[in-house]
């Protein structure tokens, strides 16, 4: 039996079953925690000066981690309150944020929060590529997609996203291991998002080529 928290494959749901978050709010819920993380790290010393109690958390990166965790929980709660479902990707990412964020604060070691993107991207990349190995295109379960594709389209798109996730994991490892914390935080917020947007736009020809019409979708 499928757990109600998890979203099913979008192709299996009718429009009446879907309770979607408005696009702008959805974008805000996805970007909000990252922006909190960036500005808390960039302005951490100022925040600590203004609110001395925050100094007990530690350096700006630790304050940013704590606020990132709080913002992530709030974003998931808002999404749940509006749709009564949690898409797989934000849910898994949120769980990893809480686990690795807690380790970061407990051990006072920012390595854990820096490895979070590596873990999440490797996990999703492994799931997608592993699914293809067993003949399953699992992209519909990872993303809350609104489009319908034929089987070949799902396979190709799943392969591309699986490889892209692995690419992001490798890039994150290179950046956090070779550059300063501030550079890594900036790249995480202002580098990964543009790269992802460009990659997504590059998939539009494939999506258009393999999109199903309403008649084809009903017949399938």
UniProtKB/Swiss-Prot annotation:
Main localization, broad class: membrane
Membrane topology according to the record: Multi-pass membrane protein
GO CC entries: plasma membrane
Keyword RNA-binding set for record: no
Localization per record: Cell inner membrane
Entry keyword annotation includes Transmembrane: yes
Spans through the membrane: 20-40, 57-77, 86-106, 123-143, 156-176, 187-207
UniProtKB keywords: Cell inner membrane, Cell membrane, Membrane, Transmembrane, Transmembrane helix
InterPro entries: YciB (IPR006008)
Domain of life: Bacteria
Protein task: Plays a role in cell envelope biogenesis, maintenance of cell envelope integrity and membrane homeostasis.
Similarity-based family: Belongs to the YciB family.
Entries under HAMAP family matching the protein: YciB
Protein name as catalogued: Inner membrane-spanning protein YciB
Phylogenetic classification of the source organism: Bacteria, Pseudomonadati, Pseudomonadota, Alphaproteobacteria, Hyphomicrobiales
Gene: yciB
């Amino acid at each position: 039996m499928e757990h109600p928290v998890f979203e099913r494959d979008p192709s299996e749901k009718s429009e009446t079953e879907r309770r979607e978050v408005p696009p702008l709010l959805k974008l805000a819920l996805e970007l909000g925690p990252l922006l909190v993380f960036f500005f808390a790290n960039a302005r951490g010393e100022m925040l600590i000066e203004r609110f001395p109690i925050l100094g007990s958390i530690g350096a700006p990166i630790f304050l940013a981690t704590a606020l990132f965790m709080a913002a992530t929980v709030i974003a998931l709660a808002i999404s749940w309150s509006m749709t009564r479902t949690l898409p797989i990707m934000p849910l898994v990412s949120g769980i990893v944020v809480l686990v690795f964020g807690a380790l970061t604060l407990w051990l006072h070691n920012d390595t854990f929060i820096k490895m979070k993107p590596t873990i999440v991207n490797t996990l999703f990349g492994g799931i997608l590529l592993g699914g293809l190995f067993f003949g399953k295109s699992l992209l519909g379960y990872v993303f809350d997609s609104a489009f319908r594709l034929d089987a070949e389209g799902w396979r190709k798109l799943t392969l591309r996203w699986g490889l892209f996730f692995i690419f992001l994991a490798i890039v994150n490892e290179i950046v956090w291991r070779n550059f300063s914390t501030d550079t890594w935080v900036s790249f995480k917020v202002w580098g990964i998002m543009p790269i992802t947007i460009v990659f997504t736009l590059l998939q539009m020809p494939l999506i258009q080529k393999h999109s199903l019409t309403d008649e084809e979708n009903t017949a399938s």
